């Protein structure tokens, strides 16, 4: 299927750019307004704004591995983004759900990879907790990646349901 760019799913890349800009703007605000390691600003009884660094991946996975993981996660993010852009190029702009999902993942992945390559770590600042139990801090890029991935999973369930209903 060879489509021109204006009819392909590449038109959804504006959303990836928006996700990237929102992520970087929020991290810049945190870096400028909250000192690193500050205990946090309580927003609600279960949510703080904090300023922490993550040298690993989700849940600080591989954070204490000496630095190679920075490059590994950067290469992985670029590879995934390349694959998603390839898929966007092959699909129609009318395939909204997957276009949005892929673009959110691309924008989030590039937001975190930018931090890794420029800062050497990812800036996290969203801290949800219950009493003394804190969920690992995360950022908007992580949220965009999660939402995009959840949309892909939900789309898989919707597709399976349609197959079951079809005679």
UniProtKB/Swiss-Prot annotation:
Its membrane topology: Multi-pass membrane protein
Free-text function comment from the UniProt entry: This protein specifically catalyzes the removal of signal peptides from prolipoproteins.
Lineage of the species this protein comes from: Bacteria, Pseudomonadati, Pseudomonadota, Gammaproteobacteria, Aeromonadales
Family per similarity comment: Belongs to the peptidase A8 family.
Residues at the catalytic site: 124, 142
One annotated GO molecular function: aspartic-type endopeptidase activity
Broad EC category: hydrolase
UniProt cross-references to NCBIfam families, sorted A to Z: lspA
Cell compartments where the protein resides: Cell inner membrane
Record gene name: lspA
Lineage top rank: taxon: Bacteria
Listed name of the protein: Lipoprotein signal peptidase
UniProt-listed HAMAP family: LspA
């Amino acid at each position: 299927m060879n489509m021109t760019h204006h009819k392909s799913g590449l038109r959804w890349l504006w959303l990836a750019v928006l996700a990237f800009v929102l992520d970087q703007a929020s991290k810049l605000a945190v870096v400028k307004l909250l000192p690193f390691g500050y205990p946090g600003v309580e927003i609600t009884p279960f949510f703080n704004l904090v300023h922490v660094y993550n040298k690993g991946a989700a849940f600080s996975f591989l954070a204490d591995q000496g630095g190679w993981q920075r490059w590994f996660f950067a290469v992985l993010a670029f590879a995934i983004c390349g694959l998603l852009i390839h898929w966007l190029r092959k699909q129609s702009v009318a395939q909204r759900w997957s276009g949005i999902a892929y673009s959110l993942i691309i924008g989030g992945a590039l937001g975190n990879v930018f931090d890794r390559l420029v800062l050497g770590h990812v800036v996290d600042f969203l801290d949800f907790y219950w009493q003394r139990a804190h969920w690992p801090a995360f950022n908007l890029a992580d949220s965009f990646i999660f939402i995009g991935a959840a949309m892909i999973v939900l789309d898989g369930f919707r597709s399976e349901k349609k197959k079951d209903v079809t005679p």
